């Protein structure tokens, strides 16, 4: 009887869920530089110490912001100080692509390593494609999944001398009938066949994370180095200098991943950078639907609010004809853009923009018709940006605004 009970316990551990909705206080897009600051660059590189032996599952839908948690039990450990590290990878089958890596130093031995429970932590290595899609929160991976993020995420944790390696199989609902579009993800540039479905059944659209609109100059004093974003001057003008999306390696090849960039900002800043990516993406609004509407409802009830879309026919009709006033929106006031006209982009003075991820007059909320979203989302859109656009987020904004009537 004990053997049967032990077997059932083991099976439940191997198939349990380890993904969860991110707490509401992680859904923000302003640049917060609070809490402990990182100490220096990591001393080591992210490694897969062994093949994962634990497989867990996670679910995501709509615009949800989620945390993938490694199942780490610190309760049995002593309080003696330890060093720790966490690496996250995506498993493409024939190779594993590194996504994020961080080291912690002199941590309380029986607490989850974090900037608050450790005496110090390293800069975070993050995979970037001009925007911050992922970051580490303590030992967990934070992201807003698209339908092309379904797949196997691998964690590799080191707690002093103890190695914990496993995989989290993320299942993203392939319904794209949400304001955030959903057509982005790690496999968007590959040959993965995903059905981009728009469900006919009415369901809430305000599902997930809708960061409060921010002042357009909020990120003015944040550098590319703090966010781990390559200076657009270095890769928009020369595509060959930009890391390959599929930079990954097999189990027996431990080469330093070029696609990981060093983000020197604190954990709170990188969380905001993920929120900024959410805010800057191309949005799909239906008639009489606005972003500020979802921001208000999300603030009141961050789980699900009944703002439904009756049918895909209405979704594909036209952008909202009457937009409500969005006084805090750097783009729209009564539906009119504040940004400089496209014809004047060439004359934008860029001398002070070289280390600024968001040009102070051009942080925009992207709005598109639902039929203008293409597979791959912002990753594909970046390839169409003019070389004169020296800021990634102004580039994203123009992609979206180019489709607004």
UniProtKB/Swiss-Prot annotation:
Residue stretches spanning the membrane: 389-405
Full protein name: Envelope glycoprotein G
Membrane topology: Single-pass type I membrane protein
Lineage: Viruses, Duplodnaviria, Heunggongvirae, Peploviricota, Herviviricetes
Sites carrying sugar chains: 83, 138, 174, 221, 288
Gene behind the chain: gG
InterPro entries: Herpes_glycop_dom (IPR002896), Ig-like_dom_sf (IPR036179)
Signal peptide segment: 1-19
Species annotation: Equine herpesvirus 4 (strain 1942)
GO CC term (a single one): viral envelope
Key words of the record: Glycoprotein, Membrane, Signal, Transmembrane, Transmembrane helix, Viral envelope protein, Virion
Subcellular location field: Virion membrane
Family the entry assigns: Belongs to the alphaherpesvirinae glycoprotein G family.
Major localization class: virion
Function, as annotated: Chemokine-binding protein that inhibits neutrophils' chemotaxis.
Gene3D superfamilies in UniProt: 2.70.230.10
């Amino acid at each position: 009887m004990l053997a049967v009970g032990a077997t059932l316990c083991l099976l439940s551990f191997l198939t349990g869920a380890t993904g969860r909705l991110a707490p509401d206080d992680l859904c923000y897009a302003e640049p917060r530089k609070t809490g402990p600051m990182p100490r220096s660059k990591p001393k080591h590189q992210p490694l897969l110490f062994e093949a994962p032996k634990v497989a867990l599952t996670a679910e995501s839908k709509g615009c949800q912001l989620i945390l993938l948690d490694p199942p780490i039990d610190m309760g049995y450990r002593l309080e003696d100080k330890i060093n720790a590290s966490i690496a996250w990878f995506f498993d493409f089958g024939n190779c594993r692509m590194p996504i994020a890596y961080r080291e912690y130093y002199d941590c309380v031995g029986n607490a989850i390593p974090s900037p608050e429970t450790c005496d110090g932590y390293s800069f975070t290595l993050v995979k970037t494609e001009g925007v911050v899609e992922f970051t580490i929160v303590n030992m967990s991976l934070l992201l807003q999944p698209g339908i092309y993020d379904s797949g196997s995420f691998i964690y590799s944790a080191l707690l002093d001398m103890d190695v914990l390696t496993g995989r989290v199989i993320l299942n993203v609902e392939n319904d794209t009938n949400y304001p955030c579009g959903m057509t982005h993800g790690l496999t968007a540039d590959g040959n993965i066949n995903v059905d981009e479905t728009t469900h006919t059944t009415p369901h809430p659209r305000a599902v997930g994370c809708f960061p409060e609109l921010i002042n357009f100059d909020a990120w003015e004093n944040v550098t590319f180095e703090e966010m781990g974003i390559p200076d657009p001057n270095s890769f928009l003008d020369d595509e060959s200098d930009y890391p390959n999306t599929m930079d990954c390696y097999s189990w027996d090849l431990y080469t330093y991943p070029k696609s990981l960039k060093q983000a020197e900002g604190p954990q709170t800043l990188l969380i905001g950078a993920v929120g900024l990516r959410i805010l800057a993406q191309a949005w799909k609004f239906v008639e009489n639907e606005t972003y500020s509407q979802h921001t208000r409802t999300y603030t009141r009830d961050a789980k699900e609010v009944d703002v439904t879309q009756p049918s895909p026919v209405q979704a594909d009709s036209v952008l909202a004809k009457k937009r409500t006033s969005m006084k805090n929106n750097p783009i729209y006031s009564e539906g009119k853009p504040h940004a400089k006209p496209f014809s004047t982009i060439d004359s934008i003075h860029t001398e002070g923009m070289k280390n600024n991820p968001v040009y102070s007059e051009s942080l925009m909320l992207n709005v598109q018709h639902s039929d203008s979203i293409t597979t791959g989302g912002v990753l594909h859109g970046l390839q169409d940006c003019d070389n004169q656009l020296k800021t990634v987020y102004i580039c994203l904004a123009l992609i979206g605004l180019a489709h607004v009537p």
